[in-house]
């Protein structure tokens, strides 16, 4: 139902001209849609319309009011938060203060930890330096020369202590002459023993020096023997090269003989092929003779078959005659229908027999024709094979001549290749000799650099040792200068502090021979347990290798 503003239904205004309008078309107002029956429209007052509209929009209006209240509350909450954000007597303020205090404490603890870590790092660095210095001092004290110096220091202290004890005993038993004499004898005996020990050590040093000189002479003899061996190896290499050239010439002459032999065999083979061709022609004639005999036998078989067919035909005629006689008897004895059936069977049998005879004759003619065609094709194939054999023989001869020419070219290339290889080997030998000389020179320079560095390191160690020994001797000499001789003697034994003889060409150094293991124990002398030939290139030359 459509509702419009206006009068109520059924209360139309009376007018005099209504009748005239009823007959005409009633125009629709602009607010009404077209094609609407005005009698179906209900008109309500404005207050009623407002009430209806308010009832329809109530939910929307209430939702808008709720949203406005919620927005106002949220705005008030934000304003309250901004207002109490810096207050300290609230839960949030106290929580924030606690967090800040905790963060500050953590930062202070972290700063203290960093300071402690830095102090610990400095302490560890100092400990490491102390450990390194202690290890260096320990390593310095473990050297043989320092050990010998410490032995001298200990000997001087022992001698000083012994003199103190002797003096004490002398003062205690001064009246005992016998004891004094005994002490004197003991001193003389000890002095004599010291002299004997010193003489023994001197003899040992002389023996060690003689042993070293003997080893040097042996090394010189070994070097001379090695040079002689190398010269002998060079002569042997020249002899081997000469034998190799002679062997190559023999191989070339042998290959030429093989070429001549192969050429001769080729000619003999061609002669044998002519003989084989004659034999094959004879075999072909024999085969033709076999074919002719086969044709004759085939003709004989055909004739026998024809005779057999004639005999069969005669027998069939006799059988037909017997059948006719029998049928003539049956005609008299049986009914007409049976006679007709028998006559029809006989006629069919005769037709079938004639058909078989005709097929046999056609088959015989076809066999004869096939035999003639086969013979003609065989003769034609023989002629074609003979012509093809002649062509192949000619081509084979040309191929042999071409192969001979190619073989000669290959032999020529091989000889050139052998010459080039010899030249390359010679160049390689020259280059290898130059490389070996350069390597030997380089190794010599490296060895000289090593000895120079060793000398510098020895001088530095000698200065360090002298400084240490001077400080110790000065400290010990403050109390007494009488017993400083063992320390001075240990210091003056020579540079290096080893047990070997001093090397005059290297500043008088006495080398310290050590074991080849991790202990580094001082050895009394040098003794090599390895191979004498530790040079790889020299070992190869000694064994005869040239690469």
Swiss-Prot record:
The gene is Cfap210. Residues 50-131, 183-251, 342-405 form a coiled coil. Keywords: Cell projection, Cilium, Coiled coil, Cytoplasm, Cytoskeleton, Flagellum. The lineage of its organism: Eukaryota, Metazoa, Chordata, Craniata, Vertebrata. Transmembrane segments: none annotated. Microtubule inner protein component of sperm flagellar doublet microtubules. InterPro entries: CFAP210, TPH_dom. It holds the Pfam family TPH. This is Cilia- and flagella- associated protein 210. GO terms for biological process: flagellated sperm motility. It comes from the Eukaryota. Microtubule inner protein (MIP) part of the dynein-decorated doublet microtubules (DMTs) in cilia axoneme, which is required for motile cilia beating. Disulfide bonds: none annotated. It is found in: Cytoplasm, Cytoskeleton, Cilium axoneme; Cytoplasm, Cytoskeleton, Flagellum axoneme. Its main location: cytoplasm. Residues 214-237 are annotated as: Disordered. One of its GO terms (cellular component) is sperm flagellum.
């Amino acid at each position: 139902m459509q509702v419009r503003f206006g009068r109520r239904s059924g209360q139309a205004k009376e007018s005099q001209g209504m009748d005239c309008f009823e007959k005409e078309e009633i125009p629709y107002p602009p607010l009404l849609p077209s094609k609407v029956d005005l009698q179906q429209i209900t008109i309500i007052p404005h207050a009623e319309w407002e009430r209806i509209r308010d009832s329809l929009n109530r939910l929307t209006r209430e939702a808008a009011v709720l949203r406005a209240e919620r927005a106002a509350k949220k705005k008030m909450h934000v304003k309250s938060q901004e207002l109490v954000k810096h207050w300290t007597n609230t839960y949030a303020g106290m929580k924030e203060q606690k967090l800040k205090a905790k963060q500050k404490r953590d930062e202070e603890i972290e700063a203290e930890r960093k300071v402690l870590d830095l102090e610990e790092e400095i302490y560890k660095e100092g400990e490491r330096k102390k450990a390194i210095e202690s290890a260096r001092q320990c390593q310095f004290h473990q050297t043989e020369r320092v050990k010998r110096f410490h032995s001298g220091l200990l000997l001087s202290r022992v001698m000083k202590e012994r003199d103190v004890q002797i003096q004490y005993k002398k003062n205690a038993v001064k009246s005992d002459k016998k004891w004094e004499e005994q002490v004197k004898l003991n001193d003389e005996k000890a002095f004599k023993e010291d002299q004997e020990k010193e003489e023994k050590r001197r003899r040992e040093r002389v023996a060690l020096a003689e042993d070293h000189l003997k080893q040097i002479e042996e090394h010189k003899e070994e070097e001379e023997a090695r040079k002689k061996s190398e010269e002998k190896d060079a002569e042997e290499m020249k002899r081997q090269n000469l034998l190799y050239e002679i062997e190559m010439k023999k191989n070339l002459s042998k290959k030429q003989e093989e070429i001549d032999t192969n050429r001769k065999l080729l000619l003999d083979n061609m002669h044998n092929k002519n003989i084989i061709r004659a034999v094959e022609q004879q075999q072909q004639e024999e085969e033709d003779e076999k074919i002719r005999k086969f044709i004759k036998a085939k003709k004989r078989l055909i004739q026998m078959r024809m005779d057999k067919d004639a005999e069969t035909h005669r027998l069939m005629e006799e059988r037909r005659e017997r059948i006719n006689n029998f049928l003539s008897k049956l005609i008299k004895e049986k009914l007409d229908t049976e006679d007709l059936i028998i006559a029809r069977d006989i006629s069919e049998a005769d037709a079938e027999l004639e058909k078989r005879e005709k097929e046999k004759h056609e088959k015989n003619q076809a066999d004869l024709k096939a035999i003639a065609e086969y013979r003609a094709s065989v003769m034609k194939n023989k002629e074609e094979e003979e012509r093809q054999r002649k062509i192949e023989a000619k081509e084979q001869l040309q191929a042999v001549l071409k192969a001979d020419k190619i073989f000669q070219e290959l032999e020529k290339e091989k000889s050139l290749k052998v010459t080039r290889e010899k030249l390359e080997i010679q160049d390689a030998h020259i280059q290898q000799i130059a490389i070996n000389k350069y390597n030997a020179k380089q190794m010599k320079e490296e060895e000289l650099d090593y000895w120079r560095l060793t000398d510098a390191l020895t001088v530095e160690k000698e200065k360090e040792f002298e400084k240490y020994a001077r400080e110790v001797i000065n400290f010990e000499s403050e109390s007494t200068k009488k017993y400083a001789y063992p320390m001075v003697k240990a210091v003056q034994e020579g540079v290096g502090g080893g047990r070997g003889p001093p090397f005059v060409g290297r500043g008088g150094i006495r080398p310290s021979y050590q074991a080849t293991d991790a202990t580094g124990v001082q050895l009394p002398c040098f003794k090599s347990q390895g191979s004498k030939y530790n040079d790889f290139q020299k070992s190869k030359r000694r064994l005869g290798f040239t690469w």
